Design a protein with these regions (language model features):
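Active-site cavity-forming subdomains of large catalytic enzyme subunits
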Residues: 207, 217-223, 267
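Cofactor-binding active-site loop characterized by glycine-rich and histidine/acidic residues
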Residues: 53, 62-211, 229-247
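Glycine/aspartate-rich loop-and-adjacent alpha/beta segment that forms the canonical ThDP
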Residues: 1-13, 271-305
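Structural motif
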Residues: 105, 186-191, 216-218, 280-284
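Conserved phosphate-handling catalytic cores of large alpha/beta enzymes
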Residues: 228-235, 245-280, 285-289
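Short beta-alpha connecting loops at secondary-structure transitions
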Residues: 223-228, 248-253, 299-305
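Cofactor-/ligand-binding subdomain signature composed of acidic, glycine-rich
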Residues: 1-70, 100-101
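Short, proline-centered helix/strand-breaking motifs
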Residues: 214-215, 249
């Protein structure tokens, strides 16, 4: 009984300390921070809308047809881009030091985060439209892109995988390598709440918790996975409870507040790089779109789908 109470007391003190650090980082946000975040989120929405336009209207192909690609939307989830402010970006370092840059694994709905970490709209559209110059060629030069499973390892942006939860496991492996090589690097692995139900995601979090790896998992609960609402996905009170089960600090934040994305990521990075281990950030948010471009009408209730 005394041992149990000691553990709970230690956890409470740790959680209070992390909460106070989040408040401190939030209080340090400047007007320049907010202007930069506004630019990032506006760019994300503009890219998102143009991708939708390309899907609906397409571009002419040599055989006389049209090609619009396949893609996923970020509507109402643009604020995740603000995590980049708290991270050491590869694009801000000399090329010789890029192995020290933080690693991020944006999900399909996190195009804004990929852009904020240094990817360009040109890279995004080249992948979406299957252009031969895309980085997303599967290792086969000139073979074209692959919708919005985009990334650029030179900028330490890991592309999403399908199934999506595998990216969490891959990022955990990269964090393990950094730990063993004593590279002072932070890793961020955002997923949706649907991903967090998968075995791969659970195994990744459990392994990170057991090894004390410098990684933060971010569960963005946008209230629906494909067509399954939250009540059909998990019985937990909040998705942050999953972190406590794995022995890592976890907290919940409002996904409509850019400052909280920054403050939470900054604290997770501090905790990880000081030897504290992994964290879980639970984001309560909502998506203003369907699962993908082809799914918007169905999501909004139209019989056509």
């Amino acid at each position: 009984g005394a041992l149990h109470l000691d553990r709970r007391t230690a956890r409470l003190c740790r959680d209070i300390a992390l909460c106070l650090r989040r408040i401190a980082h939030g209080s340090a946000v400047t007007l320049e921070h907010r202007l930069r975040w506004q630019r990032w989120m506006t760019r994300t929405r503009a890219v998102d809308e143009h991708l939708k336009d390309l899907f609906m209207n397409g571009i002419p192909t040599p055989d006389g047809g049209k090609f619009g690609g396949k893609g996923f939307r970020s509507t109402w989830q643009e604020a995740v881009a603000c995590c980049a402010t708290a991270m050491v970006r590869a694009v801000d370092l000399p090329e010789r030091d890029r192995s020290l840059a933080d690693v991020v694994a944006p999900m399909i709905r996190d195009v804004g985060l990929a852009l904020a970490m240094g990817q360009t709209p040109l890279e995004i559209f080249a992948a979406q439209m299957g252009k031969s110059g895309s980085f997303m060629d599967g290792g086969h030069v000139g073979h074209g892109g692959r919708d919005l499973h985009v990334g650029n390892w030179d900028k330490r942006i890991l592309p999403p995988s399908a199934p999506l939860p595998i990216a969490s496991a891959t990022t955990t492996g990269i964090a393990l390598a950094a730990n063993r090589l004593e590279i002072p690097r932070f890793h961020l692995a955002p997923v949706g709440e649907g991903c967090s139900s998968s075995g791969e995601c659970w195994e990744a979090m459990n392994f990170a918790g057991a090894r004390g790896l410098p990684i933060s998992f971010m569960i963005q609960n946008n209230q629906i996975a494909l067509d399954t609402f939250v009540t059909g996905q998990s019985g937990v009170e909040t998705f942050g409870d999953k972190g406590h089960a794995m022995g890592m600090p976890a907290w919940t934040m409002d996904g409509s507040d850019p400052g909280l994305f920054y403050a939470s990521t900054a604290v997770a990075r501090e905790f990880a790089t000081s030897g504290g281990g992994p964290t879980l950030i639970h984001v309560e948010t909502m998506r203003g779109c369907g699962h993908a471009h082809h799914h918007d009408d169905l999501y909004l209730g139209a019989a056509s789908g």
